[in-house]
Amino acid sequence: KSISESRNKKSLFAEFNKNVNGNFDIRFASRYEKIGSSSSFDPKISFKYSLNDSLVFRASAGSSFAAPSMAQLFASEILLGTIRGADFSDKARVIQIGNPNLKPATANNSNIGMIWKLHSNSKLTLDYWTIDYKNRIELENGSVKASLEADSQDIIRNDEGYIVGVHTSFFNEEQSKVNGIDTSFETYYDFKELGSLRYKIQGTSFLDYLTPDKDTGSMVNRVGYYNYNAHMHSIPKYKINSFLTWEKMQTKVNLITRYISGYKNKTPITSSHAALGYTDKVDDSMMVDIGVEQYFQANAYNMVLGINAINIFDKKAPRLYNAPDFSFDPNVHDARGRLINLSIQLNF
């Protein structure tokens, strides 16, 4: 159906920065935002203390505000897919509609960390962070809704009892608590006529991702699970990316690795599917990309030619038992295999 809606947005931002005694920085920032009938004032304070030339400590705390988008409020969309019912799986239409009663999402954020300069060309960072959400906006999962609310009027069945449609919408999750650790290491070497080498590795570890259980209301840690029975995606505990770049003159070579840790799948597995090799675990994933860029200059033009091989070893996405699809987790992994990209960039 056609929808005609509008709203006004106003915002005001201020920031104050002060250096104390040469080695201590304090910054205060604030933002006032009014979107439609909702408004919020969100302050943030951050500190940075240089213990010496090598070691820096940092911390921050603040709040944030996110109004629902116009699509989340009013849009409608029909998708065709597979639905896991309470006892069987069906092809069905998923009717996704907006929710005009959504509240803005708010959060309190904080972090504490350090920067350690090992020497002039290398540094290590480590940060612990936490986010406490209120009214975080989520989209109902059609399969989860059909399984947990089999008798709901939003589950449309034909005369034979098979699911032919599911109405889903956006909703405010009352509370979510997320915390984790980010770390990175980077270094740089100049080999003169042999070129330069830059290496960086960065990782994230989720410690907790707590959301309410639909039945009991108690907070459940979703880290390390496929979360088939919740209106949310999988949360692998670790994600680690590394970047190695060699550069000489007009040539650059990049080598990238992307690691995602495995996670458990509590979806009940039938004995027949277990016999086919399906398990209650989604395996780790490691993908490797490589790319080469060559720079050219012709008159007043600069040109960059590039070739990139994504997932150069053609690794398959880890197998997931998710009847009726029996394939992979599209929210985490890419099943397209090896991709070759050619690019031309012209600057003038």
Task: Give the label of every model feature segment.
Residues 14-18, 47-50, 63, 116-118, ...:
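Residue-level signature of outer-membrane beta-barrel architecture
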Residues 2-48, 107, 256-258:
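Surface-exposed extracellular loop regions of Gram-negative outer-membrane beta-barrel proteins
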Residues 23-26, 53-57, 120-124, 192-197, ...:
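Repeated loop/turn-to-beta-strand initiation elements of outer-membrane beta-barrel proteins
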Residues 30-36, 61-67, 76, 110, ...:
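Transmembrane beta-strands of outer-membrane beta-barrel pores
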Residues 10-16, 41-47, 98, 108-114, ...:
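Hydrophobic, lipid-facing positions within transmembrane beta-strands of outer-membrane proteins
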Residues 64-127, 131-132, 158-181, 186-190, ...:
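Outer-membrane beta-barrel signature, preferentially recognizing the C-terminal barrel domain
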